[in-house]
Amino acid sequence: MDRVGVLLLNLGGPEQLEDVRPFLFNLFSDPEIIRLPFPWLQKPLAWLISSLRSEKSQENYKQIGGGSPLRKITEAQAEALEQRLAEIGHTAQIYIGMRYWHPFTEEAIARIKRDRLKNLVILPLYPQFSISTSGSSFRVLEEMWNADPQLKAINYTLIPSWYDDPRYLAAMADLIAQELDKCEEPNRVHIFFSAHGVPQSYVDEAGDPYQAEIEACTRLIMQTLNRPNDYTLAYQSRVGPVEWLKPYTEDALKELGEQGVQDLLVVPISFVSEHIETLQEIDIEYREVAEEAGIENFYRVPALNTHPVFIDSLAQLVTKSLQEPPCTFNQVIHPKENMKMYPQERWQWGLTTAAEVWNGRLAMVGFIALLIELISGHGPLHFVGLL
């Protein structure tokens, strides 16, 4: 077989404090992160939010050393994966494509084109599929494929999600068991799975399978672990006033404290690498919430990073994908009518020309209100914590 390329997809993260604001701008410019009825509002709103949130976000990054370790960890994962694939008989070139910071997905694709690969496996480093993570990267890649004849000549296949892969589950169970066994009474420890949240509307209205895959993944990990511990699944990182998946991590921690839980082991189930949401949000913010709730012992399972069983899981996923019929963008992004990727299926306001005129006027009023709030520093978005 010809040399195989493997494109690892991930979020990306600012490597120094100066990167924080442009990183946030890229993040909030993504219509899969903030869905707006009018695409022309996307970048002005992203500029507004990134301008107002950058200082607070920089303070958070200062608490973990001044930048995200995500790129270095992903590079280590890529190196380990290339080595493991070589051990099982595959000559592979690994590429890294980050969605919101360097090396961007576009940079990875440029390298792939220069290397003139014929076969490519696209592997997101998100175990569970979501419109806002893997889906967002797939959407960008699909647009690039549709516009570039050179890319159309590449035989590619996607691995949409792999939350139920036995080797991945074994790696997660191994890390949990290691942390439990450090405790005086392992069976008394409450296992707390904290997943990155998404707006409830993504599941209810857009058909995102993320919640179902997270819940199934949690059950499978506990089955693989085969311990009698009680456990909870909650969702972190909520932003803004809209309802997100529940229970929220901070609320669940308070409730467990009220129930008398003394020993808690947090498992970051959405993340395979250490980054701001494990090192700062869980280790610092949620630790404080737990302590205030009366939970005496707060432990955390480390992210998978380059755990050998996890790397073997990725290698086997790549191998399996090469033996099966290819999985295409169309199969994953547009599998059924009730899963809606933006902007291919934009929200439509109004059925008549007159209605659309009023929609435009309302949008302009809303944008002016945003600018006024930016200048004054006061308003409903500040009140609810979005800005």
Curated annotation (Swiss-Prot):
Catalytic reaction equation(s): heme b + 2 H(+) = protoporphyrin IX + Fe(2+)
A molecular function (GO) term: metal ion binding
CDD domains in UniProt: Ferrochelatase_C, Ferrochelatase_N
EC supergroup of this enzyme: lyase
Annotated Fe cation binding sites: H196, E277
Matching InterPro entries: Ferrochelatase (IPR001015), Ferrochelatase_AS (IPR019772), Ferrochelatase_C (IPR033644), Ferrochelatase_N (IPR033659)
Protein's pathway: Porphyrin-containing compound metabolism; protoheme biosynthesis; protoheme from protoporphyrin-IX: step 1/1
SUPFAM superfamilies (alphabetical): Chelatase, Chlorophyll a-b binding protein
Any one of the GO BP annotations: heme biosynthetic process
Organism domain of life: Bacteria
GO terms for cellular component: cytoplasm
EC number of the protein: 4.98.1.1
Localization terms from the record: Cytoplasm
Function: Catalyzes the ferrous insertion into protoporphyrin IX.
Family per record: Belongs to the ferrochelatase family.
PANTHER family, alphabetized: FERROCHELATASE, FERROCHELATASE, MITOCHONDRIAL
Protein name (Swiss-Prot/TrEMBL): Ferrochelatase
Organism: Rippkaea orientalis (strain PCC 8801 / RF-1) (Cyanothece sp. (strain PCC 8801))
